[in-house]
Amino acid sequence: MQYSEIMIRYGELSTKGKNRMRFINKLRNNISDVLSIYAQVKVTADRDRAHAYLNGADYTAVAESLKQVFGIQNFSPVYKVEKSVEVLKSSVQEIMRDIYKEGMTFKISSKRSDHNFELDSRELNQTLGGAVFEAIPNVQVQMKSPDINLQVEIREEAAYLSYETIRGAGGLPVGTSGKGMLMLSGGIDSPVAGYLALKRGVDIEAVHFASPPYTSPGALKKAQDLTRKLTKFGGNIQFIEVPFTEIQEEIKAKAPEAYLMTLTRRFMMRITDRIREVRNGLVIINGESLGQVASQTLESMKAINAVTNTPIIRPVVTMDKLEIIDIAQEIDTFDISIQPFEDCCTIFAPDRPKTNPKIKNAEQYEARMDVEGLVERAVAGIMITEITPQAEKDEVDDLIDNLL
């Protein structure tokens, strides 16, 4: 027998009252995006559960994808069979022969939404339980916490059988908590920050600063690959590439070395905030971890934050590096993050950056530059790409292939 569909149960949606259907519709769309790599799979959702109809797709691969989608409490693979007692009996026997091992206990849990079916739930439990005893005479029944709980559901159109419940990712459907701009470098921390924001339902757009020729096409592709890894948790993500070369050269020419990192981060924050405003975001998200590097002291954060009143979410701010690495490995971003491509935060990094920068000093150095013009030109030059779970070969890939 082959699975016909996957029955999906919701996570925290039960607490959402009148907004429940909005959350469900968002989750359905997210599941559809994530499963778009399986062309034959179709997704539907109602108030109580969602269904992914396999239509011949490989169940194992689809299940692995579903495990990552935020908003799913658990799911069960389902067999669809003809709605007749004899077919149900033979199907139950076939399933039990496949999965039963010596010493296992079982029970049958039946329910019916089709009340015209010839047996009620109690009678169906007894009839199908008897069929199991015919197939496996020594099997034991256990009503509480059996090894096998074979669930039977009689609906209008057919009967459905399942015995396995697989834990989902939990959390909230991506997009139900509003939009945030993720400052995505190519490092370990920012993808983890993005993942944690996604888990709480934030629809992220990835803002990446590129400084060609100082940063390479490989660095850009690395950031896009990290973004693609994050799409498996809630669907497509907008990747926003910001041209940053002019600003970095201006900072390098007109500011003391100790303040290069502070000013660089202040410009990044301004630009991200401007993009957020244009694209109707609510917050900025970054991968800062307190004390990990010079730009992540409380004094530095204060000096950098001073350019915006927008809330800054720092999901990894209290984590040790090893804790962040553990999550990066779990979500499969670590190996990409450690690829040896320079990002724009490292190319002009000073040997001894200021760890307690003063806002008034930063403002004094910025007065030497056309801050507003630099920001406006950077925002005007952004390039937006929709990143999907399935990689598509593009010009950057071709260029990398040629270089290699």
Curated annotation (Swiss-Prot):
Pfam families in alphabetical order: ThiI, ThiI_fer, THUMP
ATP-binding found in the keyword field: yes
Domain of life, source organism: Bacteria
Any one GO biological process: thiamine biosynthetic process
An annotated GO cellular component: cytosol
Known catalytic reactions: [ThiI sulfur-carrier protein]-S-sulfanyl-L-cysteine + a uridine in tRNA + 2 reduced [2Fe-2S]-[ferredoxin] + ATP + H(+) = [ThiI sulfur-carrier protein]-L-cysteine + a 4-thiouridine in tRNA + 2 oxidized [2Fe-2S]-[ferredoxin] + AMP + diphosphate; [ThiS sulfur-carrier protein]-C-terminal Gly-Gly-AMP + S-sulfanyl-L-cysteinyl-[cysteine desulfurase] + AH2 = [ThiS sulfur-carrier protein]-C-terminal-Gly-aminoethanethioate + L-cysteinyl-[cysteine desulfurase] + A + AMP + 2 H(+)
Transmembrane segments: none
Keywords: ATP-binding, Cytoplasm, Nucleotide-binding, RNA-binding, Thiamine biosynthesis, Transferase, tRNA-binding
Enzyme class label: transferase
Domain (THUMP): residue spans on this chain: 60-165
Pathway the protein acts in: Cofactor biosynthesis; thiamine diphosphate biosynthesis
Residues reported to bind ATP: M183, L184, H208, F209, R265, G287, Q296
Role noted for this protein: Catalyzes the ATP-dependent transfer of a sulfur to tRNA to produce 4-thiouridine in position 8 of tRNAs, which functions as a near-UV photosensor. Also catalyzes the transfer of sulfur to the sulfur carrier protein ThiS, forming ThiS-thiocarboxylate. This is a step in the synthesis of thiazole, in the thiamine biosynthesis pathway. The sulfur is donated as persulfide by IscS.
Cited HAMAP family: ThiI
Family indicated by similarity: Belongs to the ThiI family.
Record-given protein name: Probable tRNA sulfurtransferase
Organism of origin: Streptococcus pneumoniae (strain Hungary19A-6)
Top-level taxonomy: Bacteria, Bacillati, Bacillota, Bacilli, Lactobacillales
